[in-house]
Amino acid sequence: MAKRTKKVGIVGKYGTRYGASLRKMVKKMEITQHSRYTCPFCGKDAMRRGAVGIWNCSKCKKTVAGGAYVYGTVAAATVRSTVRRLRDLKE
């Protein structure tokens, strides 16, 4: 793996191309997409992105659909809370 500087981190591979503000936006996105997330099934910190919107747990081998760059999205959280509220209203 190539040596990156402290300041630019994962976007050091782009060098001086594309402009500083775009590289900062890409850095935030790439850090979230390459990090590990907690698996909701087994509870381990092993959920990783396999492809765009596909998240795999390396411990329990579950595959779920999620966001493109982040496992949980704002829209998914909104839908989950709405469904929970409607379910409680029905009971």
From Swiss-Prot:
Sample GO molecular function, one term: structural constituent of ribosome
GO cellular component, one term: ribosome
Listed Pfam families: Ribosomal_L37ae (PF01780)
SUPFAM superfamilies noted in UniProt: Zn-binding ribosomal proteins (SSF57829)
InterPro entries, per the entry: Ribosomal_eL37/eL43, Ribosomal_eL43, Ribosomal_protein_eL43, Ribosomal_zn-bd
Classification via PANTHER family: 60S RIBOSOMAL PROTEIN L37A (PTHR48129), LARGE RIBOSOMAL SUBUNIT PROTEIN EL43 (PTHR48129:SF1)
Protein name: Large ribosomal subunit protein eL43
Species of provenance: Ostertagia ostertagi (Brown stomach worm)
